């Protein structure tokens, strides 16, 4: 019986092991301007004297859908509307870590809209996270992505848009690129991949893939297949790999690798500047 169940259990066990780093509390620091990796990591250190704070606010993107977290672009008051980055949370949900990521993007001059695919819920331990992730309805989540994109274009008047996500959110950043032909760029941090060129050919956006060589849930062989699929589909892409483990860019997790995270963030900043601001 156990041997027959292994093919079913193994993918779930790998996902649980890869994402198991439990979130830590964070403080209410309010950075101005671009954030270095050290400054970003400091947001996740426990400070019991100050409640968690964020620079943005929750907004309704469509009736009946969970609110999204909106962090307006910093330093653009009175100027033209800023490009918008759709932010997709990890398997923990739309928690403080993701709000800090949105604020970090806002510090770069982009308006960040963090979507909630968990209906307002978030996890405090890996078992809760796995249950929430498994309960996600694909069709309902696609509606949320489409509503977020519509809000970005019609309400925020975004001249350009991109998506970014990590782990669970990395997969959904890829799904954003498949769903939204008008998307300019998609950043995928170690998310579940699709390697079928026929499906990938629907992507019009440029793709940046960030992966970890020690990742057992998204192993290098899967990244190789993804890269081959993108090439065969004619998708403009670049792939970067780091000698780190899954979730290495999350300062609130136990697998955080500051060197790899800093290098990946440098690539992400450059990529977003190219696809959203038109910088070389």
Task: Please tell me what each predicted stretch does.
Residues 165-169, 173:
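Gly/Ala-rich beta-loop-alpha elbow adjacent to hydrolase catalytic centers
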Residues 16-18:
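C-terminal motif of bacterial Sec signal peptides marking the signal peptidase cleavage site
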Residues 156-166:
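Alpha/beta-hydrolase fold nucleophile elbow
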Residues 209-211:
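Short beta-strand/loop motif that positions the catalytic acidic residue
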Residues 101, 219-229:
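Short alpha-helix in the alpha/beta-hydrolase fold that links the catalytic acid
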Residues 231-280:
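C-terminal catalytic histidine-bearing segment of alpha/beta-hydrolase fold enzymes
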Residues 214-218:
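Acidic catalytic loop of the alpha/beta-hydrolase fold
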Residues 22-154, 250-252:
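Serine-hydrolase catalytic machinery in alpha/beta-hydrolase-like enzymes
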């Amino acid at each position: 019986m156990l041997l027959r169940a292994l093919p079913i259990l193994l993918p779930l066990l790998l996902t649980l092991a890869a994402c198991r780093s439990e979130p830590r509390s964070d403080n209410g620091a309010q950075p101005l301007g671009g954030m270095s990796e050290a400054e970003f990591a400091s947001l996740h250190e426990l400070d019991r004297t100050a409640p968690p704070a964020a620079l943005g606010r929750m907004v309704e993107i469509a009736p009946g859908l969970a609110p999204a977290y909106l962090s307006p672009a910093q330093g653009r008051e009175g100027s033209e509307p800023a490009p918008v980055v759709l932010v997709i949370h990890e398997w923990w949900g739309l928690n403080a870590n993701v709000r800090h990521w949105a604020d970090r993007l806002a510090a770069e001059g982009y308006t960040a809209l963090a979507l909630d695919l968990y209906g307002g819920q978030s996890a405090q331990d890996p078992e809760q996270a796995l249950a929430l992730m498994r309960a996600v309805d694909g069709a309902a989540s696609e509606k949320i992505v489409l509503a977020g994109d519509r809000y970005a274009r019609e309400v925020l008047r975004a001249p350009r848009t991109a998506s970014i996500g990590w782990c669970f959110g990395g997969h959904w950043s890829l799904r954003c690129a498949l769903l939204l032909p008008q998307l300019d760029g998609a950043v995928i941090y170690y998310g579940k991949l699709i390697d079928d060129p026929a499906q990938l050919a629907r992507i019009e956006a440029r793709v940046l893939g960030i992966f970890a060589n020690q990742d057992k849930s998204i192993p290098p062989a899967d990244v190789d297949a993804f890269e081959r699929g993108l090439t065969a589909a004619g998708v403009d892409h670049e792939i970067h790999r780091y000698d780190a483990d899954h979730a290495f860019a999350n300062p609130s997790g136990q697998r955080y690798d500051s060197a790899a995270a800093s290098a990946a963030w440098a690539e992400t900043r450059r990529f977003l500047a190219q696809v959203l601001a038109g910088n070389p």
